Amino acid sequence: MTLLADRAPAKVNLTLHVLGRRVGDGYHVLESLVAFAGTADRLTLDPDAPLGLTVSGPTAGPAGPTDDNLVLRAARGLAARVPGLRAGAFHLVKRLPVAAGIGGGSSDAAAALRLLARLNGLPLDHAAVGAVARETGADVPVCLDPRARMMRGAGEEIGAALGLEPLPAVLINPGVPVPTAPVFRALGLSVGQDLAGAPHPTIPQATATDTLLQALAGARNDLEAPALTVAPVIGDALAALRAQGCRLARMSGSGATVFALFADRRAAVRAAAALRAAHPGWWVAPTFLR
């Protein structure tokens, strides 16, 4: 049988409001507008080979041991829930930076679930697919159908897909991995504590870019300030983006990746070229978010 293939796009938090930390499980309660980039990892599945995973690509090294990769965790989880599930050998071409605040591992796991669902004739809203997505990681469910939408809670409340116009953007990672846990520790919320702040703006189902940018200007990423204490270079990356004349610059997730929105594709490509020349050690990607 021929190989099955899918993309695992970067997930970008255009906003990320932390509402508090809930009693019971201690999870932080979030409200976030997420979009997905044209920049992506690539995952293939060979159904004629035994279950396994190989990894190549420019960021394969930092991705860590394959046995603990979320791709295999998702595949094994689905096999445990669906008797007779056909699987196979996965190959991941890793292009996205690791521990970078853009959900690379979660998107890879979601791509694995899509490939297995396609191979076995399962709809993406199959109960087992959704359950395994939730078990594999908080960001995996929103990555199953990678289109812009609101997500809330600890990732379990996912809104309908939004009809955003494609947003010309540049993503930058300054080459410093930033695990999520230290950033949340730096935020310093106790269990049961709420975080004061302006409410998240309402994002209509279909939003013109200028209207969206006005809404984004009234929003924030509450993890940006604590992430700067963990990795101050994030501030340098944001300053470098703002110097290129962008319309908005912000950190994604818990960092260290930052993004900027530009007036058009040409401006984004021009800014990316200038940033690569000035910072050859940084990961820089002109793209669209949608």
UniProtKB/Swiss-Prot annotation:
Positions annotated as active site in the UniProt record: K11, D139
Entries under Pfam families matching the protein: GHMP_kinases_C (PF08544), GHMP_kinases_N (PF00288)
UniProt KW keywords: ATP-binding, Isoprene biosynthesis, Kinase, Nucleotide-binding, Transferase
The keyword Nucleus belongs to this UniProt entry's keyword annotation: no
Pathway as given in its UniProt record: Isoprenoid biosynthesis; isopentenyl diphosphate biosynthesis via DXP pathway; isopentenyl diphosphate from 1-deoxy-D-xylulose 5-phosphate: step 3/6
Enzyme Commission number: 2.7.1.148
InterPro entries associated with the record: GHMP_kinase_C_dom (IPR013750), GHMP_kinase_C_sf (IPR036554), GHMP_kinase_N_dom (IPR006204), IspE (IPR004424), Ribosomal_Su5_D2-typ_SF (IPR020568), Ribsml_uS5_D2-typ_fold_subgr (IPR014721)
Catalytic activity: 4-CDP-2-C-methyl-D-erythritol + ATP = 4-CDP-2-C-methyl-D-erythritol 2-phosphate + ADP + H(+)
Residues binding ATP, per UniProt: P97, V98, A99, A100, G101, I102, G103, G104, G105, S106, S107
GO terms for biological process, alphabetical: isopentenyl diphosphate biosynthetic process, methylerythritol 4-phosphate pathway; terpenoid biosynthetic process
GO MF, any single term: 4-(cytidine 5'-diphospho)-2-C-methyl-D-erythritol kinase activity
Domain of life per record: Bacteria
Protein purpose: Catalyzes the phosphorylation of the position 2 hydroxy group of 4-diphosphocytidyl-2C-methyl-D-erythritol.
Family to which the UniProt record says this protein belongs: Belongs to the GHMP kinase family. IspE subfamily.
NCBIfam families: PRK14608.1 (NF011202)
HAMAP family in the cross-refs: IspE
Descriptive protein name: 4-diphosphocytidyl-2-C-methyl-D-erythritol kinase
Organism of provenance: Methylobacterium radiotolerans (strain ATCC 27329 / DSM 1819 / JCM 2831 / NBRC 15690 / NCIMB 10815 / 0-1)
Gene name in the database record: ispE
